[in-house]
Amino acid sequence: MIFKTLLTSVAVSMAVASYAQAAIQDGTFEGTANGKNGPVTVAVTIKAGKIANVKVVKSGESAMIGDAAIARIPAEIVARQSLGVNNVAGASLTSMAIKAAATNAVKAAGGTPSEFYKAPIKKPASNIDVSYKTAVVVVGSGASGMAAAVRSQLNGNPTILIEKMPYLGGDTILNAGTLIATGSRYQREVMHETKDSPALAYKDIMHVGKHRNDPVLVKMVTEKAGSVVDWLIDDLKIPYGPAATQYPDHSASRQLGVEGRSPNFIRTMSRIFTDHGGKILMETRATSLIYKGGRVDGIHAVNSDG
């Protein structure tokens, strides 16, 4: 009698498991969830009861920041057969939206999301030391870091650019990509502004900053802006043009905007950098400087693998 009861229990368990697997339908199903900038729609393809493909089909998330999550999260869901994968650093809201939308798609397929959930994996540190020998290391891929890396590489100095996030651009990626053209050929010949000067730009910037700006840095920026703009437009062919709106705090026509805003600037500059042999290390955070003979001779850094 006991043996028969056990057999009955096993049969019931198998039937329940079989029913759970059969409940989810094969096909492609969509789900939507709110991201940072609005709805994110994800298409999930189910084959033989497994997640065969995940694709973001509609998103208004921030360029490059959201792109990092859009590229990684769907692939990891498929690889791990789990809706509980780790968020992408710096793109947590987009990551969560993709996972929530995928969860809704699984529900639409008749599946039970909990059956597709495994706790996120915390990868152990690899503790593998890797050394790179190069002429120049640039830390951070914002506008200034990217420009420094490109300039260095084009000047014949082998350069490595490291970025702690899984996307390029830093805070620059969130702005409109404007800069001042003071002292540039472009300002004189295209914008037809002849009354501007580094001294006037310095005065305007210090005024709007209520004289809290670092005067040394402001002086350097206003005196070097013209040559930088000419380099970007004439040499690198970055698509800058007069900004749609000239800020009222500027007493001369000097505001430029880049076509496609900052994401296009960063994409274009990074392509120039790598096309000329530059190396980029993503998710790599500088931790300390290496000194030799009283001078900085390198850096220590750690990547996402530890």
Regions found by a protein language model. Name each.
Residues 1-21:
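Gram-negative bacterial Sec-dependent N-terminal signal peptides
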Residues 115-133:
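A short, basic/flexible loop-to-alpha-helix module at the beginning of a structural domain
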Residues 131-161:
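N-terminal Rossmann-like FAD-binding beta1-loop-alpha1 element of flavoenzymes
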Residues 78, 82, 103-111, 154, ...:
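Sec-exported extracytoplasmic/periplasmic mature domains
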Residues 23-120:
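Active-site- and interface-proximal helix/loop "cap" or "latch" segments in soluble metabolic
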Residues 290-306:
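Conserved beta-strand-loop-beta-strand element in the redox core of flavoprotein oxidoreductases
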Residues 167-279, 283-288, 295:
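Conserved N-terminal/central alpha/beta ligand/cofactor-binding core
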